[in-house]
Amino acid sequence: MLVPKRVKHRREFRGKMRGEAKGGKEVSFGEYGLQATTSSWITNRQIEAARIAMTRYMKRGGKVWIKIFPHKSYTAKAIGVRMGSGKGAPEGWVAPVKRGKVMFEVAGVSEEIAREALRLASHKLPVKCKFVKREAE
């Protein structure tokens, strides 16, 4: 699973998820991509589940690029603990994804296979997604 090797601060602020993604809105490496149409946090487990769903459907054919990385930690307190007494312990890692960001890219397979593989991957993610193609240059 994807986790940072080392971080400066273990506990981060949650931050805001306003507006569209600034960069990474076009398909740059592969031929086809999966673009987020809503914003959300995507955990490292969800990214891994989507990757497995894609590669299994493509039967090891083609190439997959993961263009998001879970660099933000999130914390949680144990169930049954009252409010206060500081921030909870680090629970996991998330990738903040804004709308418009291309999260996964695929190349080396036909459009039908890529479309179905990315559709299966989108069912593993908490954001609404759409299939996008690389624009002709």
Curated annotation (Swiss-Prot):
- One CC-aspect GO term: cytosolic large ribosomal subunit
- One Pfam family hit: Ribosomal_L16
The record's listing under PROSITE patterns reads: RIBOSOMAL_L16_1 (PS00586), RIBOSOMAL_L16_2 (PS00701)
Q: Which residues form a coiled coil?
A: none
Enumerate the InterPro entries for this protein: Ribosomal_uL16, Ribosomal_uL16_bact-type, Ribosomal_uL16_CS, Ribosomal_uL16_dom, Ribosomal_uL16_sf
Gene3D superfamilies for this protein: Ribosomal protein L10e/L16
Q: Which key words tag this protein in UniProt?
A: Ribonucleoprotein, Ribosomal protein, RNA-binding, rRNA-binding, tRNA-binding
GO biological process assignments:
translation
For molecular function, the Gene Ontology terms on record are:
rRNA binding; structural constituent of ribosome; tRNA binding
**Which family does the entry's similarity section mention?**
Belongs to the universal ribosomal protein uL16 family.
Subunit (UniProt)? Part of the 50S ribosomal subunit.
Tell me the function of this protein.
Answer: Binds 23S rRNA and is also seen to make contacts with the A and possibly P site tRNAs.
Full protein name: Large ribosomal subunit protein uL16
Q: Which source organism does the UniProt entry give?
A: Streptococcus equi subsp. zooepidemicus (strain MGCS10565)
